[in-house]
Curated annotation (Swiss-Prot):
Keywords: Lyase
EC number assigned by the record: 4.2.1.96
PANTHER family: PTERIN-4-ALPHA-CARBINOLAMINE DEHYDRATASE
EC class name: lyase
Species assigned in the record: Streptomyces coelicolor (strain ATCC BAA-471 / A3(2) / M145)
Pfam family, one: Pterin_4a
GO MF term set: 4-alpha-hydroxytetrahydrobiopterin dehydratase activity
InterPro entries: PCD_sf (IPR036428), Pterin_deHydtase (IPR001533)
Gene3D superfamilies with a match to the protein in the record: Transcriptional coactivator/pterin dehydratase (3.30.1360.20)
Origin: domain of life: Bacteria
Reactions mediated catalytically: (4aS,6R)-4a-hydroxy-L-erythro-5,6,7,8-tetrahydrobiopterin = (6R)-L-erythro-6,7-dihydrobiopterin + H2O
Membrane spanning stretches: none
Keyword Lyase: yes
Record lineage: Bacteria, Bacillati, Actinomycetota, Actinomycetes, Kitasatosporales
Name of protein: Putative pterin-4-alpha-carbinolamine dehydratase
Length: 101
């Protein structure tokens, strides 16, 4: 069963619980700064593991000391769904362990 798109109000309510996340071009987005390129790469691997577990994948970008994510649900016509919010929450939970801010 495809995920249902969240309404604009629901997206705003979910974003209020996800500090640092925003809506950009219809996708949930967040950038993290880390202490080193190695720490950023380790976080990318950890995020990839979570994405595989959830069977939901973001656009994930590794920079010099940064990691950036952008996510929406393709099966919902590119809308934001609870799947995106769950991925964002899981990434937030693991980010601190990598020293991300």
């Amino acid at each position: 069963m495809p995920a249902e798109p969240l309404s604009p109000q629901e997206v705003e309510e979910r974003l209020a619980t996800l500090p640092g996340w925003s809506l950009d071009a219809g996708r949930l987005t967040r950038s993290y700064r880390l202490g080193s390129h190695f720490a950023a790469a380790a976080m990318v691997v950890h995020v990839a593991q979570v994405q595989e577990e959830l069977d939901h994948h973001s656009d994930l970008t590794l920079g010099y000391h940064t990691v950036a994510l952008a996510v929406h649900t393709h099966s919902a016509g590119g809308a934001v769904t609870e799947k995106d919010v769950e991925l964002a929450r899981r990434v937030e939970d693991l980010a601190a362990g990598h020293g991300a801010h």
